[in-house]
From Swiss-Prot:
The keyword Methyltransferase does not apply. One of its GO terms (molecular function) is uronate dehydrogenase activity. It holds the Pfam family Epimerase. Keywords: NAD, Nucleotide-binding, Oxidoreductase. The active site is at 145 (proton acceptor). The lineage of its organism: Bacteria, Pseudomonadati, Pseudomonadota, Gammaproteobacteria, Pseudomonadales. Belongs to the NAD(P)-dependent epimerase/dehydratase family. This is Uronate dehydrogenase. NAD(+) binds at residues 22-23, 42-44, 60-61, 80-84, 149, 175. It comes from Pseudomonas syringae pv. tomato (strain ATCC BAA-871 / DC3000).
């Protein structure tokens, strides 16, 4: 992962939710150049603040008052918090459904005008891998998790239309150090490209509510980003450098969801507790 740098004027204070998660730990490092103070939040334990340029604040996204305190004094929000895997709906409800409402309502109350929402490819996961779609294609969530991210996109759209709060909703593909399987050869998003995309999402003016697919410059992709062209996002990495390693893995069955659906195994998760 390359060292982050920017020629942009830093914000005074950015808020990153989900800072204890896998991507949150990465962004804690790569977002440093973009703000004088990075406020980090999660319900889980986080490493202590480093110096004067970090603030660490534990927060349950389901707690409206706590979220309102969290958002006070920030210039923009990068909302990566919440349940990040498929779980029973009741577990997703608090953090992902109530939580995103609390984030936007706190943004409205405190005058925050830019949100970066970590949406997901699981918003469109029931499309087949032989289909090419764009941000205007009807959503086809593949899971309760995907439903919660679809709801978050609707929340972003509503708060722009009603209150003028701008959002870039990033439908993140698979952001890991390297692709872990054949599906991820198409969905992989490098950490460096994620940071490049976040920079464009933070600084591009007049985004309204823009939906962009978070994916690197992979050889085979299923997602057309033309409706997010104003962001001028130009990924530099590609999954092809991992092709030989991934191709050496055993070939899944043709009807394996990971080989059929854009959302992969999520389409077959749950219902939980129902035999």
């Amino acid at each position: 992962m390359a060292s982050a740098h920017t020629t942009q004027t830093p914000f005074n204070r950015l808020l990153l939710t989900g800072a204890a998660g896998g991507l949150g730990k990465v962004l804690r490092e790569t977002l440093r150049p973009y703000s004088h103070i990075l406020r980090l939040s999660d319900i889980a334990e986080m490493a202590p603040a480093v110096g004067d340029h970090e603030e660490v604040q534990v927060c349950d996204l389901a707690d409206k008052d706590a979220v309102h305190r969290l958002v006070e004094g920030v210039d923009a929000i990068l909302h990566f918090g919440g349940v990040s895997v498929e779980r029973p709906f009741e577990e997703i409800l608090g953090a992902n459904i109530c939580g995103v409402f609390h984030i936007y309502e706190a943004a409205r109350r405190h005058g925050v005008k830019r949100v970066i929402f970590a949406s997901s490819n699981h918003v469109i996961g029931f499309y087949k891998q032989n289909e090419t779609i764009d941000a205007h294609s009807p959503r086809r969530p593949d899971s309760y998790y995907g439903l919660s991210k679809s709801y978050g996109e609707d929340m972003a759209s509503f708060y722009f239309d009603r209150y003028g709060i701008e959002t870039v909703s990033i439908r993140i593909g698979s952001s890991f150090p390297e692709p872990q399987n054949r599906r991820m050869m198409s969905t992989w998003l490098s950490f460096d490209d994620l940071t490049r995309l976040l920079e464009r999402a933070l600084y591009t003016p007049d985004v309204g509510h823009t939906v962009v697919y978070g994916v690197s410059d992979n050889k085979t992709v299923w997602w057309d980003n033309r409706f997010a062209s104003k962001l001028d996002y130009a990924p530099k990495d590609s999954s092809e450098v991992f092709r030989a390693k991934v191709d050496a893995q055993p070939m899944p069955a043709d009807d394996d969801p990971a080989m059929v659906y854009q959302g992969g195994a999520f389409v077959a998760s749950g219902p939980f507790g129902d035999k």
